[in-house]
Amino acid sequence: MSSSYYVNALFPKYTAGTSVFQNASGFTEATSCAFATNSQRSSYGAGASAFPAPMAGLYNVNSAIYHGPTMYNTGYNLNSDSYNLRCSALDQNIPVLCSDLSKQGCEKLDQTNVHPQAESNFRIYPWMRNAGPDRKRGRQTYTRYQTLELEKEFHFNRYLTRRRRIEIAHALCLTERQIKIWFQNRRMKWKKETKAGSSSTTSEEKQE
């Protein structure tokens, strides 16, 4: 029993060459692919349009979307210009919006001009400034009074406690870090002096 028997039994009302849609205004006859003849199937080639003639203008890639003739133009008396009214208004507003972004209001304000009075009243000390990675730290210079007081303290105490270091820093108008570094350098100098003195005494004893 051939397969055509089942096809005819299941679909008795469909015959070869019959169209799926009835003839209507604005549409062409489109035959079913399953029941089309060989001559009709060969017409669906690469060059054939995928859509009917009235819809080709709407989906044509090469032409504008709204300029092609459609089946709605005749029914509602719409021209191609009516579709471009809203789009033209948006196109005109786009450069206006983009030009607003380049105004001075979008630029970052200079922080130096925000609070000029507050910065003039605020006193910045040299040790409060942020030192960059390429900037060399200058050598700390001490006055004669500061050096004298530090030498006195070092004569009695080689190492300082934190509490004593804070007291000296407030008394001499220095920071704790400066006091700590001075005592570290002074201890290194003292060790070199004692080491040199001990070596000289041993050499003198050997000569005797």
UniProtKB/Swiss-Prot annotation:
<keyword id="KW-0804">Transcription</keyword>
<dbReference type="GO" id="GO:0009952">
    <property type="term" value="P:anterior/posterior pattern specification"/>
</dbReference>
<keyword id="KW-0238">DNA-binding</keyword>
<dbReference type="InterPro" id="IPR020479">
    <property type="entry name" value="HD_metazoa"/>
</dbReference>
<dbReference type="InterPro" id="IPR017995">
    <property type="entry name" value="Homeobox_antennapedia"/>
</dbReference>
<dbReference type="InterPro" id="IPR050296">
    <property type="entry name" value="Antp_homeobox"/>
</dbReference>
<keyword id="KW-0805">Transcription regulation</keyword>
<feature type="short sequence motif" description="Antp-type hexapeptide">
    <location>
        <begin position="124"/>
        <end position="129"/>
    </location>
</feature>
<dbReference type="InterPro" id="IPR001827">
    <property type="entry name" value="Homeobox_Antennapedia_CS"/>
</dbReference>
<dbReference type="InterPro" id="IPR009057">
    <property type="entry name" value="Homeodomain-like_sf"/>
</dbReference>
<protein>
    <recommendedName>
        <fullName>Homeobox protein Hox-A7</fullName>
    </recommendedName>
</protein>
<dbReference type="InterPro" id="IPR001356">
    <property type="entry name" value="HD"/>
</dbReference>
<dbReference type="GO" id="GO:0000978">
    <property type="term" value="F:RNA polymerase II cis-regulatory region sequence-specific DNA binding"/>
</dbReference>
<dbReference type="Pfam" id="PF00046">
    <property type="entry name" value="Homeodomain"/>
</dbReference>
<keyword id="KW-0371">Homeobox</keyword>
<feature type="DNA-binding region" description="Homeobox">
    <location>
        <begin position="135"/>
        <end position="194"/>
    </location>
</feature>
<keyword id="KW-0217">Developmental protein</keyword>
<keyword id="KW-0539">Nucleus</keyword>
<comment type="similarity">
    <text>Belongs to the Antp homeobox family.</text>
</comment>
<comment type="function">
    <text>Sequence-specific transcription factor which is part of a developmental regulatory system that provides cells with specific positional identities on the anterior-posterior axis.</text>
</comment>
<dbReference type="InterPro" id="IPR017970">
    <property type="entry name" value="Homeobox_CS"/>
</dbReference>
<dbReference type="GO" id="GO:0000981">
    <property type="term" value="F:DNA-binding transcription factor activity, RNA polymerase II-specific"/>
</dbReference>
<dbReference type="GO" id="GO:0005634">
    <property type="term" value="C:nucleus"/>
</dbReference>
